Amino acid sequence: MIDLKSIWNDKRKITYFFLANVCFLISGLSSLIVGVWLYSSKNNFIELTPTSYSALSAAGLCVFTGVTIFIIVAVGYLGVSWSNKSLLYSYIGFVILLILVHGIARITGSLHKEEAKENLRKSMLHNINTTAVVTKIGREIKLSLTWDHLQRELQCCGVDNYTDWHYSVHWPNNLYTPDSCCDPQHFDAENGTENCGKLPDEQSLLYQKGCFPKFSDWLYHHIILVNWVTSILFVVEILLLILSLVVLRVLKNSRHKTRRSHRERDPETTSENMRLNSMDRIADARLETDTVEDGMSINSR
């Protein structure tokens, strides 16, 4: 027969709380690593994506979560170790905040998947005719270099196909494409692919598939990883919220027991209580006497 009291006593509750926080800390470290990896792996193409579908959005969420978890775990550990209810209330508030953030992020990512893909496609089509962008720190980036890197790495051309480059602002009167659209397997190492995009009659030498399907799938597979991380964190945070409320009740009960034991051990308090109790008994006796006398007087009348 399993003794539930030995498994779920006050000491075990606090131990479970600490163990859950260790798991929470590990998941926070994992989230931080994923965020840094997402930023470094997608940073080369970040200028081609809209803000709503930006790699930095997912990376920023993971980094924010990781750093916040470190702070939350520290607050929770100190709150329980010092039996400080204010710190524990702060811990509960932070956990609820993360639950809301991850819940909203998970639902939004599931509901607006197709809309985000269409926004990505429109942004890529717009950027084909944009020569450069200026970052928030004032640095100018030539989009032609970003497109060249994207097309060579993903072996694609344009958004839907190579015709997206025709009559672009780079060559408004010609059916040219960037040299990065040329498939290297059709060229020898000696001649290379220089000016191959200016051969409109040799379109078979170009990558035939557009970059949008590959780029969106590439981003989406990485975002799936983020969704898994947020889902795991969401479950852990719900568990921590329940355990933190249980521990808060344990601390309150412990404080009440401590105060009661101090009162019982304090002789002055005990004698004062006895004096007050005796005075209460005297007052009760007087009240009973007065009640009896009043009753007798009424009967005599």
Swiss-Prot record:
InterPro entries associated with the record: Tetraspanin/Peripherin, Tetraspanin_animals, Tetraspanin_EC2_sf
Any GO MF annotation of the entry: identical protein binding
The organism's place on the tree of life at top rank: Eukaryota
UniProt-annotated location(s): Cell membrane; Basolateral cell membrane; Cytoplasmic vesicle membrane
Transmembrane segments: 17-37, 60-80, 87-107, 223-243
Extracellular side: 38-59, 108-222
Membrane-related topology note: Multi-pass membrane protein
Annotated family: Belongs to the tetraspanin (TM4SF) family.
Protein name: Tetraspanin-21
Gene behind this protein: tsp-21
